[in-house]
């Protein structure tokens, strides 16, 4: 827990940002926090962040990629998809006092976790002209499957206000105030009419973690789960509602296999649907 690792550091704590298999969107969210970061520069020092530093030669680039450490707080983006990733995250954990995973890839495997439901060699053969040059693991897994994680920040991409809250909370030695309720709460707070009740639009809001501000429902589009499962989601009821809204079994499976495909809750939807189809009617 971050509260147990809160800074008892007399000098400025050091921050490191790491990339694994991802699109860099969550790192860009940190760079987008321009004014907020300026306000924190006297309290924390960014020591390792490839996205915001100039390129170097091969030797310097390798050293910067691996990082020297130790670091007080590491933010890790991306999932583990190669043997090299699996080895490097162990190194990152060893040189990090606190480790926070940021984004759907790091917390739930990302879209690349679609390989978990198929044969990765089939994907490689379909995409690459020379598949023999590609070395990838059979699955894409979150960081927590490989090393202990002190806090997870969800989203695709993460919310900038939540990111600043995590950094500020670490500096203050307290638990980050990140809500664990569903997107439905955010719709009510901003006065958005429920699009499922009013229009029959399929929406994952009831089982999706809050954090986006309910942007999609505000524009008449159903939530598609980019922040991953909420706390204790009722997936059985959600699947039943999606059926009533006219979604096919294949589309129900697809809607849960997007940004957070490897989350245990969303990954179980296929088994849940099969179980219900085999059950005799009440």
Identify the meaning behind each predicted range.
Residues 105-110:
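Short gly/pro/ser/thr-enriched loop/turn and capping motifs at secondary-structure boundaries
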Residues 78-80, 104:
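Short glycine-/small-residue-rich Rossmann-like dinucleotide-binding loops
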Residues 113:
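Short aromatic-enriched loop/helix-cap "lid" or pocket-rim segments at secondary-structure transitions
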Residues 83:
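Short substrate-entry loop that stabilizes the transition state in hydrolases
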Residues 101:
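Catalytic or ion-translocation cores adjacent to nucleophile or general acid/base/metal-coordination motifs
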Residues 116-120:
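Short, hinge-like loop/turn segments at secondary-structure boundaries
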Residues 1-75, 86, 90-98, 121-282:
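Iron-sulfur (Fe-S) cluster-binding modules
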């Amino acid at each position: 827990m971050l509260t147990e690792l809160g800074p008892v550091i007399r000098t400025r704590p050091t921050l490191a940002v790491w990339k694994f298999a991802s699109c860099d969107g969550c790192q860009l969210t940190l760079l987008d926090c321009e004014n907020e970061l300026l306000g924190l520069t006297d309290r924390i020092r960014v020591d390792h962040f490839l996205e915001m530093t100039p390129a170097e030669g091969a030797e310097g680039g390798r050293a910067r990629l691996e990082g020297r450490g130790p670091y007080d707080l590491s933010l890790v983006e991306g999932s583990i998809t190669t043997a090299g990733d699996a080895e490097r995250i162990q190194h990152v954990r060893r040189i990090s006092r606190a480790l926070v995973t940021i984004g759907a890839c790091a917390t739930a495997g990302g879209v690349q976790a679609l390989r978990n439901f198929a044969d990765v060699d089939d994907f490689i053969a379909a995409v690459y002209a020379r598949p023999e040059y590609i070395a990838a693991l059979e699955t894409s897994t979150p960081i927590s499957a490989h090393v202990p994680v002190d806090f997870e920040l969800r989203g695709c991409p993460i919310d900038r206000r939540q990111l600043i809250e995590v950094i500020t909370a670490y500096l203050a030695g307290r638990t980050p105030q990140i809500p664990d309720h569903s997107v439905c709460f955010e719709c009510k707070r901003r006065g958005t009419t429920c699009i499922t009740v009013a229009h029959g639009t399929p929406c994952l809001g009831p089982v999706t973690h809050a954090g986006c501000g309910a942007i999609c429902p505000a524009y008449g589009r159903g939530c598609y789960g980019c922040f991953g499962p909420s706390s204790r989601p009722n997936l059985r009821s959600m699947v039943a509602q999606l059926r009533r809204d006219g979604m096919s079994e294949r589309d129900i499976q697809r809607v849960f296999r997007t940004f957070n495909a490897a989350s245990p809750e969303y990954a179980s939807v296929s088994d849940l649907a099969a179980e219900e189809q085999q059950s005799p009617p009440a």
